């Protein structure tokens, strides 16, 4: 899906890691939620409340998912899932564009 129709955008940005990670929340009529954001190069550790599907629209990074011993390379358009109530790490190599879907 290249665009979203009939949504509400929350104006206030979600800002993490001193502005190196930012996103905007997109609310859908069915009650679901996504965030659209940008990751600057750097190393990040994130926690989840809900299950998340991270769709990398463009970028270059390594991702270490919960329970995994090794890092997974993500280049270009790829996605990965993160369980609820867990943590994952990202080592972003170049500016990356993402869409995160929250599965409650």
Curated annotation (Swiss-Prot):
GO cellular component: cytosol
Keyword Zinc: no
Keyword set, alphabetical order: Glycosyltransferase, Transferase
Catalytic activity annotation: a purine D-ribonucleoside + phosphate = a purine nucleobase + alpha-D-ribose 1-phosphate; adenosine + phosphate = alpha-D-ribose 1-phosphate + adenine; cytidine + phosphate = cytosine + alpha-D-ribose 1-phosphate; guanosine + phosphate = alpha-D-ribose 1-phosphate + guanine
Classification via InterPro entries: Ppnp, RmlC-like_jellyroll, RmlC_Cupin_sf
One GO MF term: uridine phosphorylase activity
Pfam families, alphabetized: Ppnp (PF06865)
EC number: 2.4.2.1, 2.4.2.2
Tagged with keyword Cell membrane: no
Domain of life: Bacteria
Disulfide-bonded cysteines: none
Top EC group: transferase
SUPFAM superfamilies xrefs: RmlC-like cupins
HAMAP family per UniProt: Nucleos_phosphorylase_PpnP
Chain's role: Catalyzes the phosphorolysis of diverse nucleosides, yielding D-ribose 1-phosphate and the respective free bases. Can use uridine, adenosine, guanosine, cytidine, thymidine, inosine and xanthosine as substrates. Also catalyzes the reverse reactions.
Family: Belongs to the nucleoside phosphorylase PpnP family.
Listed name of the protein: Pyrimidine/purine nucleoside phosphorylase
Organism: Leptospira borgpetersenii serovar Hardjo-bovis (strain JB197)
Lineage of producing organism: Bacteria, Pseudomonadati, Spirochaetota, Spirochaetia, Leptospirales
């Amino acid at each position: 899906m290249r665009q979203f129709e009939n949504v509400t955008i929350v104006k206030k940005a979600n800002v993490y890691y001193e502005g190196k990670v930012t996103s905007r929340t997109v609310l859908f009529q069915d009650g679901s939620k996504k965030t659209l954001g940008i990751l600057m190069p750097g190393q990040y550790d994130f926690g989840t409340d809900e299950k998340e599907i991270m769709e990398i629209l463009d970028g270059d990074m390594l991702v270490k998912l919960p329970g995994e011993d090794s890092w997974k390379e993500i280049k270009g358009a790829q996605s990965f899932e993160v369980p609820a109530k867990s943590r994952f790490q990202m080592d972003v190599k170049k500016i990356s564009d993402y869409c995160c879907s929250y599965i409650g």
